[in-house]
């Protein structure tokens, strides 16, 4: 099973230009709103037509601008789960699912329907209409309709965005179990790094219609190449840098100097530091003084906003600090007891390990 996508599409001022290949895997398209994720899926499904390029699925050409091939959606064998599930509102659950069964006698279709209702735990809901179902039930019906269609590729467009939080994680386990039994390619569009990390072996980072980075999902999270990839994988702290030495940089937006574990190359324009990787100073490398700012309490951690202070204790210190970019520090509640002493304006010393400083390209 394989999917090759090499397409361009101009829509107003937006230019989509993506090239990637999937080989029997679950592949994520991760990016901010408006970066071209859903547009890419619509081009593959035949809902939108690229201006140029090729789309090939398991050796079948779905689209080729030069050869003037553009198969209609019903001939592409693409299963597309829309954000709103796109169930037929005037059809019952069983009729929605039967729409996906392409061939077979009436008895064979009914047997397939019965098996599908059992597999997706929809027994007892056969005669209900979509409006009478919960969000999770609607999603299961939509997935059931896709699977009985036996598509060559399944595309999930923000599959959990319409669900309440308490249902989301439960349904993620159910969807993952369904996909384990599927032998084709799966494309998943999401802006949620948690969903991408849980579901997808490989990821493509999209930025303004372009591929910013692609590779193994875990590798991208551990070592993003550029600012876009780092931001989309959850990094909150960025600073422009000036190279001081092979393993030393000045963080221009913070007025701080850091030692790095990775050699600093000419292409590196920024550093990124994940918010949970700072620690209270303990007499090691890369320690600095900050001014305590706002604190946001979450159920299991604190978010602390800090401003770096250069030359702690010097006159004019406060004015210098106010000009610097803030640093986000995420603190587990298990560590928070020792931090209760701090109030807004207090000084605190933090550290960061050289190996936790990410050297990033621009873009």
Provide a role label for each language-model segment.
Residues 27-28, 70-72, 76-86, 187:
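ABC nucleotide-binding domain signature
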Residues 48-49, 56, 86, 102:
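A position-specific signal in ABC ATPase nucleotide-binding domains
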Residues 38-41, 141:
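ABC ATPase nucleotide-binding domain helices that frame the ATP-binding cleft
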Residues 42-45, 80, 84-92, 98, ...:
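Short switch/coupling loops within ABC ATPase nucleotide-binding domains
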């Amino acid at each position: 099973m394989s999917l090759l996508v090499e397409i361009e599409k101009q829509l107003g001022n937006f230019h989509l230009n993506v090239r990637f290949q999937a080989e029997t895997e679950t592949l994520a398209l991760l990016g901010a709103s408006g970066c071209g994720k859903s547009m890419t899926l619509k081009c593959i499904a035949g809902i939108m037509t690229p201006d140029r390029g090729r789309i090939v699925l398991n050796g079948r050409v779905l689209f080729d601008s030069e050869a003037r091939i553009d198969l209609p959606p019903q001939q592409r064998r693409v299963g597309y789960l829309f954000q709103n599930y796109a169930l037929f509102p005037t059809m019952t659950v069983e009729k929605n699912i039967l729409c996906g069964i392409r061939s077979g006698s009436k008895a064979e279709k009914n047997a397939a329907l019965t098996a599908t209702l059992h597999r997706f735990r929809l027994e007892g809901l056969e005669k209900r209409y979509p409006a009478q179902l919960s969000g999770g039930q609607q999603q299961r019906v939509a997935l059931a309709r896709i699977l009985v269609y036996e598509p060559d590729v399944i595309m999930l467009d923000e599959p959990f965005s319409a669900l309440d939080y308490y249902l989301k994680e439960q349904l993620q386990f159910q969807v993952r179990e369904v996909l384990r039994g599927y032998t084709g390619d799966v494309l998943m569009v999401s802006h949620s790094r948690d969903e991408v990390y849980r579901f997808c072996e490989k990821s493509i980072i999209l930025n303004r219609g372009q591929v910013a980075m692609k590779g193994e999902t875990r590798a991208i999270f551990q070592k993003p190449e550029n600012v876009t990839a780092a931001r989309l994988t959850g990094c909150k702290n960025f600073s422009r840098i000036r190279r001081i030495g092979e393993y030393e940089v000045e963080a221009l937006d913070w007025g701080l100097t850091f030692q790095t574990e990775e050699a600093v190359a000419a292409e590196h324009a920024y550093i990124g530091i994940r918010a949970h990787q700072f620690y209270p100073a303990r007499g090691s490398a890369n320690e600095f003084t900050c001014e305590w700012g706002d604190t946001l309490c979450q159920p299991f951690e604190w978010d602390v906003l800090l401003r770096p202070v250069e030359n702690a204790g010097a006159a004019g210190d406060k004015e210098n600090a106010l000009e610097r970019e803030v640093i986000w520090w995420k603190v587990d509640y298990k560590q928070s007891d020792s931090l209760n002493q701090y109030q807004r304006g207090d000084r605190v010393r933090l550290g960061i390990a050289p190996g936790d400083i990410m050297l990033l390209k621009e873009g």
